[in-house]
Amino acid sequence: MSRSSATLIGFTAILLWSTLALATSSTGAVPPFLLTALTFTIGGAVGIAAGLARGVGLSVLRQPWPVWVHGIGGLFGYHFFYFSALKLAPPAEAGLVAYLWPLLIVLFSAFLPGERLRPAHVAGALMGLAGTVVLLGARAGGFGFAPEYVPGYLAAAACAVIWSVYSVASRRFARVPTEVVAGFCLATAALSALCHILFEPSVWPVGSEWLAVVALGIGPVGIAFYTWDIGMKRGDVRLLGVLSYAAPVLSTLLLVVAGFAAPSGALAIACALIVGGAAVATLLARR
């Protein structure tokens, strides 16, 4: 598989993640850890079924413990700290801090062998971050980082660091088959179910809400993690980091099309910054 093909496959994860908000809005009052448990169970099943269809047996899950620490720590760790951040701090501020992960991916990629971090990559990532600031700030009517929410900000920062480290470190585990991600998903589902039992009331999906849960499990919480794994292991990590800032903008555009949000000047500015950042990272970095 070529580097450009792997990058394109990795970008499909970003496209799928942009549907998260719209799909999640159709799951009703299902609490976050229960929703995570349900969707990751489906996502894990999708991976196992796809592997078996290609002749890859369950023996592929026999991996050294560092592989499991990396995978479960990345998937479950990110979601645990993200949900904690949303409970401990206002969603806008928590979301902004959490969305430092694309920039961190770009910066951390400099530590990978054979990768060279160019100023254009950093500039593109900063433009993407600026677009996210404009978009999230407009939604919330501004930001107000208050001292009493420091635990929430720290939790959001933790999830940003965890996901960026997981993503970049995937290159270190390039020989581990992508099918192993199914095991990460199922382990994340089990730990999320435990957190649900300990911390949340049980509100199960009803009627058409199950369709949204299944769609999440197949797409943004299923296929996306497998394609992201391919992109991180074989694609352009720096470019995928910059392109990740497209997710919140595409997510908002989908909400506008579906009638859940209104178009705004902030959305247009965010689009311009993120598209411009991607262009800077793609074109100037080649010179």
Swiss-Prot record:
<keyword id="KW-0029">Amino-acid transport</keyword>
<feature type="transmembrane region" description="Helical">
    <location>
        <begin position="32"/>
        <end position="54"/>
    </location>
</feature>
<feature type="topological domain" description="Cytoplasmic">
    <location>
        <begin position="285"/>
        <end position="287"/>
    </location>
</feature>
<feature type="transmembrane region" description="Helical">
    <location>
        <begin position="177"/>
        <end position="198"/>
    </location>
</feature>
<feature type="transmembrane region" description="Helical">
    <location>
        <begin position="119"/>
        <end position="139"/>
    </location>
</feature>
<keyword id="KW-0677">Repeat</keyword>
<feature type="transmembrane region" description="Helical">
    <location>
        <begin position="66"/>
        <end position="86"/>
    </location>
</feature>
<protein>
    <recommendedName>
        <fullName>Aromatic amino acid exporter YddG</fullName>
    </recommendedName>
</protein>
<keyword id="KW-1003">Cell membrane</keyword>
<keyword id="KW-0997">Cell inner membrane</keyword>
<keyword id="KW-0472">Membrane</keyword>
<dbReference type="Pfam" id="PF00892">
    <property type="entry name" value="EamA"/>
</dbReference>
<feature type="topological domain" description="Cytoplasmic">
    <location>
        <begin position="55"/>
        <end position="65"/>
    </location>
</feature>
<keyword id="KW-0813">Transport</keyword>
<feature type="transmembrane region" description="Helical">
    <location>
        <begin position="209"/>
        <end position="233"/>
    </location>
</feature>
<feature type="topological domain" description="Cytoplasmic">
    <location>
        <begin position="234"/>
        <end position="236"/>
    </location>
</feature>
<feature type="topological domain" description="Periplasmic">
    <location>
        <begin position="199"/>
        <end position="208"/>
    </location>
</feature>
<feature type="domain" description="EamA 2">
    <location>
        <begin position="151"/>
        <end position="281"/>
    </location>
</feature>
<feature type="transmembrane region" description="Helical">
    <location>
        <begin position="91"/>
        <end position="111"/>
    </location>
</feature>
<comment type="function">
    <text>Amino acid transporter with broad substrate specificity. Can transport various amino acids, including L-threonine, L-methionine, L-lysine and L-glutamate.</text>
</comment>
<dbReference type="InterPro" id="IPR000620">
    <property type="entry name" value="EamA_dom"/>
</dbReference>
<feature type="topological domain" description="Periplasmic">
    <location>
        <begin position="140"/>
        <end position="149"/>
    </location>
</feature>
<dbReference type="GO" id="GO:0005886">
    <property type="term" value="C:plasma membrane"/>
</dbReference>
<feature type="transmembrane region" description="Helical">
    <location>
        <begin position="265"/>
        <end position="284"/>
    </location>
</feature>
<feature type="topological domain" description="Cytoplasmic">
    <location>
        <begin position="171"/>
        <end position="176"/>
    </location>
</feature>
<feature type="transmembrane region" description="Helical">
    <location>
        <begin position="237"/>
        <end position="258"/>
    </location>
</feature>
<feature type="topological domain" description="Cytoplasmic">
    <location>
        <begin position="112"/>
        <end position="118"/>
    </location>
</feature>
<feature type="topological domain" description="Periplasmic">
    <location>
        <begin position="87"/>
        <end position="90"/>
    </location>
</feature>
<comment type="similarity">
    <text>Belongs to the drug/metabolite transporter (DMT) superfamily. Aromatic amino acid/paraquat exporter (ArAA/P-E) (TC 2.A.7.17) family.</text>
</comment>
<feature type="transmembrane region" description="Helical">
    <location>
        <begin position="150"/>
        <end position="170"/>
    </location>
</feature>
<feature type="topological domain" description="Periplasmic">
    <location>
        <begin position="25"/>
        <end position="31"/>
    </location>
</feature>
<feature type="topological domain" description="Cytoplasmic">
    <location>
        <begin position="1"/>
        <end position="5"/>
    </location>
</feature>
<feature type="transmembrane region" description="Helical">
    <location>
        <begin position="6"/>
        <end position="24"/>
    </location>
</feature>
<feature type="domain" description="EamA 1">
    <location>
        <begin position="7"/>
        <end position="136"/>
    </location>
</feature>
<feature type="topological domain" description="Periplasmic">
    <location>
        <begin position="259"/>
        <end position="264"/>
    </location>
</feature>
<keyword id="KW-0812">Transmembrane</keyword>
<dbReference type="GO" id="GO:0006865">
    <property type="term" value="P:amino acid transport"/>
</dbReference>
<keyword id="KW-1133">Transmembrane helix</keyword>
